[in-house]
């Protein structure tokens, strides 16, 4: 796996077929991960994830697999989706066993720096589930502000300084 950039504790690598089993474990964790996705999907198969990785690589998507520098354990994936007009949507999923260890805050602040400084985005926005209070807290800590809310989605944004 090729490392694209890094932070104090995290390597941000290209997505890889080597991590399919880790991806599947994460996205099919309904208790800690999947129930907060902003789309309804009960179960992901190995074929689903393989196609997702192959598409991400082929289309050079801005999606990164995060790995703990020290233990080499898979943390999760983070992505800048729909990059157009100097804006992108942030998406992040952290595997259940790596939650509540500060990786989310570190990953988001690092990706914001990469997106604003290296890629030249002026606005990064996101959507999350209103019941995902931990994530909303982290997003606010990283400088995101809420700009809209529906019964099933909270919309947040951050502008480049």
Q: What are these model-derived regions, one by one?
A:
Residues 22, 48-52, 106, 110, ...:
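Alpha-helical elements of Rossmann-like donor-binding domains used by nucleotide-donor carbohydrate transfer enzymes
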Residues 94, 100-115, 136-141:
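Conserved acetyl-CoA-binding loop-helix of GNAT-fold acetyltransferases
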Residues 122-125, 129-133, 142-161:
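C-terminal "cap" of GNAT-fold acetyltransferases
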Residues 72, 102, 132:
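Conserved G/P- and acidic residue-centered "switch" motifs that form tight phosphate/ATP-binding loops
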Residues 18, 44, 85, 133-134:
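Short alpha-helical
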Residues 19, 98, 102, 143, ...:
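Conserved functional loop/turn residues at catalytic and ligand-binding sites
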Residues 1-50:
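A short, well-structured alpha-helix characteristic of acyl/acetyltransferase catalytic modules
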């Amino acid at each position: 796996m090729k490392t694209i950039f890094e932070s104090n504790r995290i390597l941000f690598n290209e997505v890889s077929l080597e991590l399919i089993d880790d991806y599947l474990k994460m996205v099919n964790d309904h208790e800690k991960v999947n129930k907060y996705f902003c789309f309804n999907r009960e179960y992901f198969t190995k074929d689903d994830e393989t196609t997702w990785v192959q598409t991400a690589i082929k289309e050079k998507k801005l999606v990164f697999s995060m790995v703990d520098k020290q233990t080499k354990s898979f943390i999760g994936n983070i992505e800048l989706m729909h990059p157009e007009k100097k804006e992108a949507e942030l998406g992040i999923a952290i595997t259940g066993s790596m939650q509540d260890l500060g990786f989310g805050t570190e990953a988001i602040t690092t990706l914001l720096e990469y997106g604003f400084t290296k890629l030249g985005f002026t606005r990064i926005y996101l959507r999350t589930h209103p019941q995902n209070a931990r994530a909303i807290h982290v997003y606010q800590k990283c400088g995101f502000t809420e700009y809209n809310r529906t019964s099933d989605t909270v919309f947040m944004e951050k502008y480049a300084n």
